[in-house]
């Protein structure tokens, strides 16, 4: 598999829940530093860029020897979608008509833990299956919608999804994104304008 793969490490500076979370120290290094390490461990990533509106994130990216792109303010709000950020990064690095990578790996800079080889397994799965994208997921386990409740106006609760499932073993398998790794074909990413 000799195809170019671009990793885009994304970290916004304006987090409301935990300001500066990507640059906070965790066991002696900034949280985003763990993502930089994961990128370096990949055998398949051929280029990496850090996309951020935060000067400290960009500084850390430069210190790690990575390319950096200052993200425009309109792509750095709490409601900004990720695809436009990824498209911005690809277009900033590869001009019109230039050869572009076959795939883009989106990595959140505030995710310090990823299993060994996880990024490469996702990239390999993308190319081996011919699918448009791959993302990491985890079982919802006991937090299954079948076992969730709505609260009515009078304060009583009722099952959110009507069902007669009482044993965990009988729950249909459902999964939730972990946010650890997203990989997509560049042509699909760029074709999904709008």
Question: Where on the chain are the PLM-derived regions?
Answer:
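N-terminal glycine-rich phosphate-binding loop and ensuing alpha1 helix
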Residues: 4-51
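Histidine-centered beta-alpha loop that forms part of the nucleotide-sugar donor binding/catalytic region
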Residues: 12, 73, 138-139
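Residues that recognize and position ribonucleotide moieties
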Residues: 16, 105, 182
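Short, high-confidence coil segments that cap the C-terminus of an alpha-helix
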Residues: 45, 99-101, 128-132
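Short, polar loop motifs at secondary-structure junctions
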Residues: 52-57, 186-188
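Short phosphate-binding loop-to-helix
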Residues: 55-105, 114, 121
């Amino acid at each position: 598999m000799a195809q170019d793969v671009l990793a885009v490490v994304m970290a916004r500076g304006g987090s409301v829940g935990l300001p500066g979370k990507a640059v906070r120290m965790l066991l002696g290094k900034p949280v985003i530093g763990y993502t930089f390490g994961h990128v370096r461990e990949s055998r398949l990533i051929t280029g990496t860029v850090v996309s951020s509106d935060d000067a400290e994130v960009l500084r850390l990216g430069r210190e790690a020897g990575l390319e950096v792109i200052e993200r425009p303010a309109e792509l750095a709000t709490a409601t900004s979608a990720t695809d436009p950020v990824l498209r911005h990064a690809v277009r900033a690095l590869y001009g019109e008509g230039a050869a572009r990578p076959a795939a883009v790996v989106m990595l959140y800079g505030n995710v310090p833990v990823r299993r060994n080889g996880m990024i490469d397994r996702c990239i390999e799965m993308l190319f081996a299956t011919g699918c448009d994208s791959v993302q990491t997921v985890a079982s919802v386990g006991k937090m299954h919608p079948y076992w969730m409740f709505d609260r009515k106006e009078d304060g009583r609760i009722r099952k959110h999804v009507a069902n007669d499932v009482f044993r965990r073993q009988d729950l249909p398998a459902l999964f939730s994104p972990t946010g650890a790794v997203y990989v997509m074909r560049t042509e699909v990413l760029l074709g999904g304008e709008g």
